[in-house]
Amino acid sequence: MTAFDLHAPFVPKGDQPQAIEKLTTHLQSGHSRQTLLGATGTGKTFTMAKVIEEIGKPTLILAHNKTLAAQLCNEIRSFFPNNAVEYFISYYDYYQPEAYIPVTDTFIEKTASINEEIDMLRHSATRSLFERQDVIVVASISCIYGLGIPAEYLKASIPLKVGAEVDQRQLLRNLAAVQYTRNDVDLGRGRFRVKGDVLEIGPAYEDRIIRVEFFGDEIDAIRYVDPVTGETLQSLEGLNVYPARHFVTPTERLEMAVEAIDAERTAQVEHLEGAGKLLEAQRLNQRTRYDLEMLREVGYCNGVENYSRHLAGRQAGEPPECLVDYFPKDWLLIVDESHVTVPQIRGMYNGDQARKKVLIDHGFRLPSAADNRPLKSEEFWQKVGQCVFVSATPGLWEIELSENRVVEQVIRPTGVVDPEIFVRPTTGQVDDLLAEIQERVGRQERTLITTLTKRMAEDLTEYFEERGVRVRYLHSEINAIQRIEILRDLREGVFDVLIGVNLLREGLDLPEVSLVAILDADKEGFLRAERSLIQTIGRAARHVRGQAILYADNLTDSMEKAISETERRRKIQLAYNKKHGITPQPVKKGSDNAILAFLEVSRRLNTQELEDAYEQADDLPLESVPELITQLEAQMKEAAKNLEFEEAAKYRDRIKNLRSKLLGQQSP
């Protein structure tokens, strides 16, 4: 038995038992790379969970976007309710990196909005990795970016133990040194307050409050308490308080870093002047001197991450520490949808370096700023011991690395067969598709439509709306959380048809979808390649009446291969169903997502969105007004807390107007 305790209302069926056994055997034999070739709807996540339980190692599950990571984390948490299942994605709600455009001589300052709740989940992940063995972290590609030095982070943690003698003043100084701020009025995450002999800390990694009670200089009690009621949730003998930020720099290291930065500044200014770049040299000298002064005085400056090589004591070109460095020596990596995720790992470094080079060449940053970067692909894979690639369409790179350790999982436990595929001419395709949609609406089933261009998707959405179809258009400007909400609304029947371009392929778990329509299926290219077609067709593979219609005037090689592979899988499933007397059963899966619910509670509209919503309040449905009032109240309280009383008064007046509107419309 391992530390992982899997709970599931079903047992492995179909191809799952042999896939679990083979993957487990490969891993226990010490093989470093293997692939699970699992068709859509065959229960790949359950197979992953069983392998994790059997192997018993801390595991990182890597997904290629936040939406898929949230979906995976929710499923894995349901399988392992008693283990630490963590969620690690980028904590930016909005991020615009600094950049310089030489052609127009335009410098763009870095602007970012950090989601505090996601930051808390990131801290929770690293805390679990320090304290437990039964840890599963579901992460997006952001896990290959720098995260501070694990040893320094752990060394900076503050141990507290009942009965220990502690200098209270020194303890408060220690908390301030690891980025906690004192606030005796409003205790929140990353803050602490003192009331008599009681110290309360809002840890960076959870929403419970740590209460430390003293008797003189002796710690008398340590408790977790509810942040609202103050009720005791748990009494403890001891704990570690981890820093409020992952980047922790000891004083002596900071002093050494300042010297190194200053030396690099001198050398680079001389280099630029020697090359005749006097403006660039002056710019770099001025900017870096200001940053150095800030670092000496307060230990921080804007854009401090650009000095991370010096602050961490790394050599030039040395890879930064990231999430994988927080894992113990023996851990397991599972790469979900590997045919997309693996190329992402390769692409992150090159894009980052192209932007940094321009900044360095024009005197905005020192050359060492190039080392504030994500891992290179080869650096990442050097840190990985054992790995399982998971995909319905794995890439050649994964298959070659796995040698003969490619495990197929094609048979679905539910007996659901791969979609029937129909190829129809493009003439009259929209009206033909409308008839298909109406048929499915009558059966309360959903439809996905994929187009080649954004313009066509918009026009198609408008056309269907005019004909009474409840339709939405999923486009690239929709953020991760809104995307999850749209997919949930599709599942719950708020609308019936979802149209997109390259947004409807990997990992979408939509059992209600019975039809996938692919327009311009014969236009060869990335969006209509064999792998893309198989993935898109697979979105209907969870429904007992799943069908895919490919609108095309020619049969391309990619279409032939995709149709052939889907037909091969259909035959395998049909033969299995016949042999075992299985009648296909619809997939029953709730649409709730605990991660989504958490993020929805935490999400606040930004100021511009609130302005727009308020201006359009007259057009809002009545049931939406209370939500807008709640958002405005949150902004009003935030403004008052920051002593911005004029801003708070503006929100108060708007809330009054909205409440009047609400009362006026509700009265008979």
Swiss-Prot record:
Which CDD domains does the entry mention?
DEXHc_UvrB, SF2_C_UvrB
Entry-linked InterPro entries: Helicase/UvrB_N (IPR006935), Helicase_ATP-bd (IPR014001), Helicase_C-like (IPR001650), P-loop_NTPase (IPR027417), UVR_dom (IPR001943), UVR_dom_sf (IPR036876), UvrB (IPR004807), UvrB_inter (IPR041471)
What name does this protein carry? UvrABC system protein B
Locate the residues binding ATP.
38-45
PROSITE patterns hit by this protein: HELICASE_ATP_BIND_1, HELICASE_CTER, UVR
**SMART domains in UniProt:** DEXDc, HELICc
Organism equals: Acaryochloris marina (strain MBIC 11017)
Is Coiled coil a UniProt keyword of this protein? no
